[in-house]
Amino acid sequence: MNQANVKNTTFHSMTSVSYNLSPYCSTGTTFRKQPLYRIWETESSTSADLSQKLNYMFPKLGLSESQTSLKDKDVTKDVVCQDIHWSVDATSLFTINSDYGIRQYLIPDPKSDQTLLNPYSRIFAHESVLSSDISPRYSLYEGSSEPLANSILIGAKNVPIKLVDLNDTNNLSTIRSYDISNLENEKFETPYVLKYHRESLFLSGTVRNKVNVYDVNRREPVNTLTYSRRSKCGTQSYKSIISCLDDSFSDNQVRYCGSYKNQVFIIDLRGKTLQLLNNLQGNGARGCYQIINSDNGSYLYVLQRYSSRIEILDHRRPDRPVNHLELPGRSDFQKLKACYNGSFQVGSPLGKGQILSWDKSTIESGGITRENQVVQCQPDILYNVPQCKSMRINIIKTSSDATAISYSGDTAGIALLQR
């Protein structure tokens, strides 16, 4: 990230280097609290103005099913970004928003005079999107002729998982859907997390400690893994939700997942059973929501709700956490999603427009020295984003050239920072 205004900041007992960062582009006041239909109309009119200014015909932005009816009701809601996905070539990004919108933004040159992010395309889901993941091959400019490459998976309550065509820039066009019904009661099992494993496979975490594995070309799961524990009376099934899957993307047959009961499991895709790696109950946290791997594959970084630390697990010594990253305060129900791409970054639970950062050497060692000494892991750098000083940074997603952040508070939006 470009850095300015260096100073020292006390963090607990250590002194961290602090920098101020200024976004070079953001959504500005687009998502400030106002009637939803006005937000949508503002985006559409801005898109039309840009088309005229640049002499380029941008796709017409899709309309919400509720756009006309909401004009009479004057419904005012915060529109918060729930997730961010970068395209494979980092030329565009997608956001999943609380107004059911799926927006694609083109990434401007930091040296240009464009400071406002406005959707290049916008489609609306029919219901609130709980989980999503973009095709690992998606690119707007180098798009494949194969529809599956230009798609996004979305999951919601009481409907099948959908693979949505991103070539259709203003309508929700489903390429295919995937069965998530429970054969015993014929009810849909909500997909709380979706992650691609390879280009042709994806995983879904759902209720009753269950992970489904899908081939993108088949409607039914090709494998299902569950977890149960032994009790004196036989097998007792935990009725917990698989809430997160690790962020790795490789041909490795082993993945990891976490539950809202603070359990972390090993997923061996060749088997049928989830293996318990660690139970993080007892630290006061209320459920895992993100798992990030170190590049060397040795350490897992587990983020939990209502926690003042990020637990570090070593899969070679799974009996207990080997260390933790210290946070300056306790998180709450809101998920602060981190990113690891050269450095490990997460928004501060205290808000104030702050980003906490740990360097690669800390993450790859788990904060353990060669002499096997455990080191306190306060952030190495504290980034301040003055434009967001009264807000909380909820999501951080980096590409090769830029860092995208989502923030909420007095207003909500997304912004781009140079790496």
UniProtKB/Swiss-Prot annotation:
Disulfide bonds: none
KW Nucleus (keyword) present: yes
Entry keyword annotation includes Nucleus: yes
Gene Ontology CC, one term: nucleus
UniProt keyword terms in alphabetical order: mRNA processing, mRNA splicing, Nucleus
Highest taxon in the source lineage: Eukaryota
Classification via InterPro entries: SWT21/TCAB1_mRNA_Telomere, WD40/YVTN_repeat-like_dom_sf, WD40_repeat_dom_sf
Family, similarity comment: Belongs to the SWT21 family.
Function: Involved in mRNA splicing. Helps to stabilize the U1 snRNP-5' splice site interaction.
Protein name (database record): Protein SWT21
Species per Swiss-Prot/TrEMBL record: Candida glabrata (strain ATCC 2001 / BCRC 20586 / JCM 3761 / NBRC 0622 / NRRL Y-65 / CBS 138) (Yeast)
